[in-house]
Amino acid sequence: MPRIHVLPPGLVNQIAAGEVVERPASIVKELVENALDAGATAIGVDVEEGGLALVRVADDGSGMDRDDALLALERHATSKLRDAEGLAAIGTMGFRGEAVPAIASVSRFRLDTSPGEDGAGTRVEIEGGVLGEVAPVARPRGTTVEVRDLFFNTPARRKFMRAASTEAGHVSEAVIRLALARPDVGFTLRSGGRLVLGARAGGGLADRAGQALGREAHRHLLPVDARRGEVRVHGLICSPDHSEATGRALYLFVNGRYVRDRAAAHAVLRAFAGTLPPGRHPAGVLFVELPLDRVDVNVHPQKLEVRFAEGREVFDALFHTVAGALRTAPWLRARPQAAPAGEGPPAGGEAVAVPLAGEDAAAVLAWARAARPPEGSGATLVQPAPGAWATGRLAFPIAPAPDAGPEAAPRPEGYFAGLRYVGQHARTYLLCEAPGGTLVVIDQHASHERMLFHRLKEAFRARRIPVQPYLLPQVVTLPPAAARALEAGLAELGRLGFDAEPFGGDAFAVKGAPAALAGVDLTALLTDLGSQLADVERGSAVDDAFHDLLATMACHAAVRANQDVSPEEARALLDGLDAIDFKARCPHGRPVVFELSLADLERRVGRR
């Protein structure tokens, strides 16, 4: 007698259910996707006990006649795929034809459906994979599927189910994902008779995103839409002012299908680099569209993962689209424009968009410490040409006075240039007044750090970081671990603008450093850089890590808290901030600016 034999169909379906039916939420996903493929415009989902007692999905789609209803319960029977060529370009949500029979094999299953011809429909009942009653039923066009007593015949599976409240949460998340994918379709979800989600058809993606992400996130949503090659990325992303503790609030869809893709999520996170605090994640709803034959959706039992023909193309499209939207988004209000005589402000009180300043204003960004080495170092720096820098503790280009004549360079236009500088508080914060009486508080270290980081990053991308050579090398001694990492990463250090070489033991002779970092404590800076390089693998990961390395350099060079800043220096900083992107956050994600409106101030002191 042969030891190998063909399994009976019922057991085959139960094995398939182990892949397709992970929990009640999996059933909801499969049935709702079938409804969407059937052209439904309204879908209702009802669950009891988290879906373990009942899952009901009703739709107004195309429905089926008696013959198709019976065929739909056969394994690998489908209307969505006919040949191998179709498998290479799948445009429907489902295509394998195994979900419905798998679900029916582990539940008490009932299907009511009608194609809408004279109200005549068909009812099919199945219990544990065994066909029961097949009878006519009167009903409107569409399909209703009821799944009761899930895993009643496979108690080993049922004992692994979580509490009903946990399973209900998974069902809710599954419906939210499907509702986000199709704002043109109405969705309702009831759990235990209580309405959990009601999303009307045609309300728009912003409304759906607000329901999924919450009211606070809805306030910070920004539109994104761009195409790179064959890949289009569009949707909504929250500004850095709203972030999440995990990455679960970032919904990614590929050709309308929700997917989990680490590389795609990393592309979005990388676009937010320097705008979010450590450990925080972006939120949003993003759609990736590309030709069907450029993505394989047949790689995961629940179709939650996909494989791209050109993964780098998708990564770049996501990164550049999101980064571009963040760069151009109005994090802060634009500078109010004076209205012509006889005209009031723009309707609705909306700010007028003002383009960022160009290269003239960008010259202000080279605000750095005086070019002098630490005492006792024995190093001497090449000094800039006389008159190019102001004297004093901090050096920065002096803008021409307002009455300097017709050749005077125009002041930058923008939010910060429109502020009136009031003074410094606690030797850490710059206090300014905005038009309308709003009090603006600026963190002097965070803002200067962002400005220096911007300049370093732009110079790094262009491979032309200005280097200040030392007349005599400066010798620094580092901790052993940092010294080893720095010696292994001398090539990367050179790309950052440092000219250094080993000098025996844990010492290095530094012959030059980036000009923007003149006067910093090289030992402390190189120790930090060495610690970061120790965590970086050679190769492509180094490029990702350069953001952190440049941020560290900017942090060491920026003006500190508890440090005096003159009005001229404060004004130069304000003018320079308008010429850079991501001005509302430092490279480590901390806020740069805080506003207190006059109305809020008056409420706090009892004037309102």
UniProtKB/Swiss-Prot annotation:
SUPFAM superfamilies: ATPase domain of HSP90 chaperone/DNA topoisomerase II/histidine kinase, DNA mismatch repair protein MutL, Ribosomal protein S5 domain 2-like. It comes from the Bacteria. Keywords: DNA damage, DNA repair. One of its GO terms (biological process) is mismatch repair. The keyword DNA repair applies. Pfam families: DNA_mis_repair, HATPase_c_3, MutL_C. The keyword DNA damage applies. Coiled coil: none annotated. GO terms for molecular function: ATP binding; ATP hydrolysis activity; ATP-dependent DNA damage sensor activity; mismatched DNA binding. Gene3D superfamilies: 3.30.230.10, Histidine kinase-like ATPase, C-terminal domain, MutL, C-terminal domain, dimerisation subdomain, MutL, C-terminal domain, regulatory subdomain. InterPro entries: DNA_mismatch_repair_MutL, DNA_mismatch_S5_2-like, HATPase_C_sf, MutL/Mlh/PMS, MutL/Mlh/Pms-like, MutL_C, MutL_C_dimsub, MutL_C_regsub. HAMAP family: DNA_mis_repair. This protein is involved in the repair of mismatches in DNA. It is required for dam-dependent methyl-directed DNA mismatch repair. May act as a 'molecular matchmaker', a protein that promotes the formation of a stable complex between two or more DNA-binding proteins in an ATP-dependent manner without itself being part of a final effector complex. Belongs to the DNA mismatch repair MutL/HexB family. This is DNA mismatch repair protein MutL. The lineage of its organism: Bacteria, Pseudomonadati, Myxococcota, Myxococcia, Myxococcales.
